[in-house]
Design a protein with these regions (language model features):
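Short, acidic, Ser/Thr-enriched surface-loop or helix-capping motifs
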Residues: 51-52, 78
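Ser/Thr-centric signal marking residues that sit
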Residues: 33, 77, 101
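Glycine-centered coil/turn sites that cap beta-strands in beta-rich domains
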Residues: 4-50, 59-63, 71-74, 95
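Surface-exposed loop/edge segments in extracytoplasmic proteins
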Residues: 55-61, 100
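Signal that preferentially marks extracellular ectodomain short beta-strand elements
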Residues: 72-84
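C-terminal tail/sorting-segment detector
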Residues: 6, 64-67, 82-108
Length: 108
């Protein structure tokens, strides 16, 4: 579960030091989980939940944010507000050309 997938689009590999996506807590979780992250620069932030097939389940953050420590919550629902089934999900932080993805487990 500690596997981290990171991808920086474009030539600038230094972006990795400007953003940090932490492990969600709790993990595994039952109904709610917190996702914390740090921005060292301001930017348009997206945090998206995906199923293991890469389908978007829910976008929980999509806004310009100032630098600092941040937290987002996911209540195990999709974009329509419907509960999702138990299983493994991915969550991704995107800021500019930076993208980092981690896994989480929903138990019911």
């Amino acid at each position: 579960l500690n596997e981290t997938l990171g991808k920086i689009k474009g030539p600038n590999r230094m972006l990795n030091s400007y953003y940090n996506l932490n492990d969600n807590y709790p993990n595994p979780f039952n109904s709610n989980t917190s996702i914390t992250y740090r921005l060292y620069t301001d930017g348009l932030v997206r945090i998206t939940i995906y199923d293991m097939l890469g389908n978007v389940i829910k976008e929980i953050v999509n806004e310009v944010q100032n630098s600092g420590y941040k937290r987002a919550e996911w209540n195990a629902t999709d974009n329509l507000g419907q509960p999702v089934s138990a299983g493994v999900y991915l969550y991704s932080l995107e800021v500019g050309n930076f993208r980092q993805t981690k896994k989480m487990i929903l138990l019911k």
